[in-house]
């Protein structure tokens, strides 16, 4: 086949190995059978996109309808490390990282569990994962929440519920904790209380925020409970190298330290209890080993925590992963919400993008497992009932509790 490349050069492409790879789309959930030949599917005058790999082998490509956004931040300083607003700036100036506000889906759950842990619940608390019907006046209907698997798992510890992203337990947890108390707590991360829904659907991430804000709020977990203000620009210099702008938010502290010749001793302020931050992060680290984020194991690092997110009908998917040095969140979906397909989840769409980004830079990121804060103890428990383990118990493990 003869094609015209982006440099207006006419080249010949061997397409004999491509035909077997082409399947026409029927809908978001189905593909047709392999085409028999190019001429049976394409016509003269059709515009076909090709792309080549490093070996100059060509394959059929598409200009995607689906979009994505990525925000990467240093959770200690707030410096933005990377920001991607979409597939192509030339085709769309819309910055999805900043302007889009897709629903969070299950990526919201760590915030709810943090509220629970700071209000009397703990990772060993048992909540029954069983069918339940809520009559919610704000939803104006009876609501029967379901897990993504369609199954129910019986009495479940909150640790297991978060790392396996169980919907039913999460909704029951919010119902027990209370919507008003939860909304008050969420303002500590930066959520606007009056914008949050007044119904139980908030438990499953019915609220939408930008990927940029999601990265900012998640940084509280990565930063040991402390909130940061993101910074885009550190300094600007002119063509002659003269500094014409410098971010001065830490300038007075730095100058004073230089004058007195030693670091200032500052009282740290926390948005949330550092013990809560540690416990949530510990659960999300475990989620990367045996939960919904286990594909992270490909990095061969155990200091990263992560949480997937999938909204109702798979209209938006998320993955947020972090350690103390870097936090990156990825959103994946359409500008005008519609289903990505029944088999698409945060683990199959957003997580691979996160992983591709991290694989390029992971060797430069310092190994940084979270430090256990004061007044947090580990106790051996019976994993079936969450109670202190007895000498005769077989199914046991350690869990963290506030001292």
Language-model features: locations:
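Mid-domain, small-residue-enriched loop/turn segments at the edges of structured enzyme/sensor domains
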Residues: 140-146, 178-216
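Short active-site loop at a secondary-structure junction
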Residues: 30-39, 63-68, 91-111, 124-130, ...
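Extracytoplasmic/secreted proteins, especially bacterial periplasmic and envelope-associated proteins
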Residues: 103, 111, 115, 122, ...
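Active-site SXXK
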Residues: 77-78, 101-129, 161, 217-221, ...
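A penicillin-recognizing enzyme superfamily signal
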Residues: 2-72, 83, 90-93, 164, ...
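Short acidic, glycine/proline-rich loop/turn micro-motifs
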Residues: 92-97, 140, 197-200, 339-343
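Conserved catalytic neighborhood of penicillin-recognizing serine enzymes
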Residues: 76, 121-180, 227, 240-279, ...
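Proteins synthesized as precursors that undergo proteolytic processing into mature forms
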Residues: 41, 89, 117, 124, ...
